[in-house]
């Protein structure tokens, strides 16, 4: 590390800073810090338990009402309908798309190719 021109003058203060930092870290007591004392009971400390009492039954009722949605019957019906609507004829559609894409690409390539290199289309 190259020190700037003023580096030689700041080197003693940098060393002092490092020594003080090492001393502070070394003098820290080892182990876990003591926990903070419990806060006094106030109205605000009762808020989480009150919210849990109000929201808990609501969540339970909602979970019970929507249980049918997460069951295997609803999901199986959705997957079957999706397959019938979108995936049943995917193989033939994909094959037709690949064939038409290949034909379009060949026609475009032959249209760009000069006659001297590719020959006449009528000779094929």
UniProtKB/Swiss-Prot annotation:
Tissue expression: Blood plasma, associated primarily with VLDL and HDL. Expressed mainly in the liver.
Family: Belongs to the apolipoprotein C4 family.
GO cellular component, one term: high-density lipoprotein particle
Keywords for the protein's UniProt record, in alphabetical order: Glycoprotein, HDL, Lipid transport, Secreted, Signal, Transport, VLDL
GO biological process: lipid transport; positive regulation of triglyceride storage; triglyceride homeostasis
Function: May participate in lipoprotein metabolism.
Localization per record: Secreted
InterPro entries with a match to the protein in the record: APOC4
Primary localization: secreted
Keyword Transport annotated: yes
Post-translational modification: Glycosylated; contains sialic acid. Present in up to five sialylated isoforms.
Pfam families, per the entry: APOC4 (PF15119)
Signal peptide: 1-27
Protein name: Apolipoprotein C-IV
